[in-house]
Swiss-Prot record:
Pfam families: F-box (PF00646), FBA_1 (PF07734). Residues 1-47 form the F-box domain. Signal peptide: none annotated. It comes from the Eukaryota. It comes from Arabidopsis thaliana. This is Putative F-box protein At3g24580.
Length: 378
C-alpha cells in the first residue's frame, strides 16, 4: 500500500487541496515534502480554487471572527438550519496562543492585528493567515500607554497585478493630542501626514476596507450634528471629501458599516427610540463618490427582539440572495452579558439567534469581517 507521503507530487497536491484552510498548518508540520508542496504557488492556486468552488456550491461565506482575544475562521450559510448555519473552521493560530488580539482589520486577504500584553502594551502585526506569514510593525504610542489609535489597512494599486500595502494610524482627540501617520510595507517606514480635519471619527468607530481604501462613519467636529462617510485614499495618501449617507442617525442610534462581496458598502441603522433597523447598500462606491440604492435592502421593526444592538461594537454582514442580515453582538438579557450571540434577521422581521458560547470578558464584543485568502507575500 502506498503511503500518503510517497505519493507523486501531482497526486499529493490533488489530495491536499481538499484540506481546510485551518488544517494547513498541521499538514505542513506532518511531512517536510508536504510543507514544501503546500507553500508553492501551484498548490496554493489549486487549493484556493477548490475552496472557492466548494463555498460557492454550498452558498457559504468565509468570515474572520475575533472573539475572546482570539481570531477564528468561520463559514456561514444562512440557507442551512439555524443549528448549522455558523460553522467554526478553527482558530487561526499563527500568532501563538500567548498573543491577545484586541482589534483586527481585513484587506485583500491580509489581517492587521492589534495585540496587547499583560501590561496593556499594544503592538501591531501584519498577518497573512494562508501562508502563516507575519510582520511585527515597530511603532510608538506618543500620547498614552494604552492604544487609543484608529487603524486601517489598504493599498496603492501600482498596476493590474502590483499592490503596495500601507497602514494608516491616527489619533485625534484634541489639537494637542492629534497625530496621523502612514506606514509603507515595502520601505518599512512611517511618515507623518499633514491632516487637519473639520470632522471627527470617534475612536470606537471601525473602518471598512474596500478596493484598497477605507471608509468610516464620521460627524461634525463640534457637537453631534450631521453624520457622513469619509474615505482615506491609500493611493493619494489623503482623506477625500465627505460622502452622504442614505439616512441621518440620531446621537444614540446604532450605525455600522460592512462590505458586500468586496465590491459595495452596506450600512446598518437602528433607531434607539423605535428600534427600527434599516440596511442600505451602495450601487457605486469610490473615494470621492457614492450612490445608494434607492430601495432599502431591509427595514424591520425590532421590538420583538426588545433591544438595540450595541452602538459601539456591533458588526454584521448581509446575504443578498436570502435577504437577511447577521449581526454579531451579546445576549441582551442582562446589562452586561457574558454570552456571545449571532442574530439572524430576515426581511419579514423574523429573527433567530446562534449561541457562540460564553465570553471570557463580558465587555469584549465579538467582531466579524469578510475574509478572502490571499497569495500575497510581504
Amino acid at each position: 500500500m502506498t503511503k500518503m507521503s510517497n505519493l507523486p507530487n501531482d497526486l499529493a497536491e490533488e489530495v491536499l487541496s481538499r484540506v481546510s484552510l485551518t488544517s494547513l498548518r498541521n499538514v505542513r508540520l506532518t511531512c517536510k515534502d508536504w510543507n514544501t508542496l503546500s507553500k508553492g504557488e501551484s498548490f496554493a492556486k489549486n487549493h484556493l480554487g477548490y475552496q472557492a468552488i466548494v463555498a460557492a456550491k454550498e452558498k457559504e461565506f468565509m468570515m474572520v471572527l475575533m472573539m475572546d482575544f482570539r481570531v477564528y475562521l468561520i463559514r456561514v450559510n444562512v440557507h442551512n438550519d439555524i443549528e448549522s448555519c455558523i460553522k467554526p473552521e478553527g482558530e487561526l493560530i499563527s500568532l501563538g496562543d500567548e498573543v491577545d488580539v484586541s482589534q483586527v482589520f481585513h484587506c485583500d486577504g491580509l489581517l492587521l492585528c492589534i495585540t496587547e500584553d499583560n501590561e496593556d502594551n499594544a503592538k501591531v502585526v501584519l498577518w497573512n493567515p494562508y501562508w502563516g506569514q507575519t510582520r511585527w510593525i515597530e511603532s510608538t504610542n506618543n500620547f498614552h500607554k494604552l492604544d487609543m489609535y484608529t487603524y486601517a489597512l489598504g493599498y496603492k494599486k501600482s498596476s493590474k497585478s502590483s499592490r503596495s500595502y500601507k497602514i494608516l494610524r491616527f489619533i485625534d482627540f484634541s489639537p494637542t493630542c492629534s497625530e496621523f501617520k502612514i506606514y509603507n510595507i515595502n520601505s518599512d517606514s512611517w511618515k507623518v501626514l499633514d491632516v487637519s480635519p473639520d470632522w471627527k471619527i470617534d475612536s470606537y468607530i471601525r473602518g471598512v476596507s474596500l478596493k484598497g481604501n477605507t471608509y468610516w462613519i464620521a460627524r461634525e467636529r463640534h457637537g453631534y450634528g450631521h453624520t457622513f462617510l469619509v474615505c482615506f485614499d491609500f493611493t493619494r495618501e489623503r482623506f477625500r471629501s465627505r460622502l452622504p449617507l442614505p439616512s441621518q442617525p440620531c446621537v444614540l442610534d446604532t450605525v455600522s458599516l460592512s462590505s458586500v462581496r468586496e465590491e459595495q458598502l452596506a450600512v446598518l441603522f437602528q433607531c434607539s427610540s423605535t428600534l427600527e433597523m434599516q440596511i442600505w447598500v451602495t450601487t457605486k462606491i469610490e473615494p470621492n463618490a457614492v450612490l445608494w440604492n434607492s430601495k432599502v435592502f431591509l427595514a424591520v421593526d425590532m421590538h420583538s427582539l426588545k433591544f438595540q444592538f450595541q452602538v459601539r461594537a456591533s458588526s454584521f454582514f448581509i446575504d443578498e440572495e436570502k435577504r437577511v442580515v447577521v449581526v454579531f453582538d451579546k445576549e441582551k438579557r442582562y446589562l452586561a452579558s457574558s454570552r456571545n450571540k449571532a442574530y439572524i434577521v430576515g426581511v419579514d422581521g423574523t429573527w433567530e439567534q446562534v449561541d457562540l458560547g460564553m465570553s471570557v470578558d463580558k465587555f469584549v464584543y465579538p467582531l466579524v469581517c469578510s475574509y478572502v485568502p490571499s497569495l500575497v507575500h510581504f
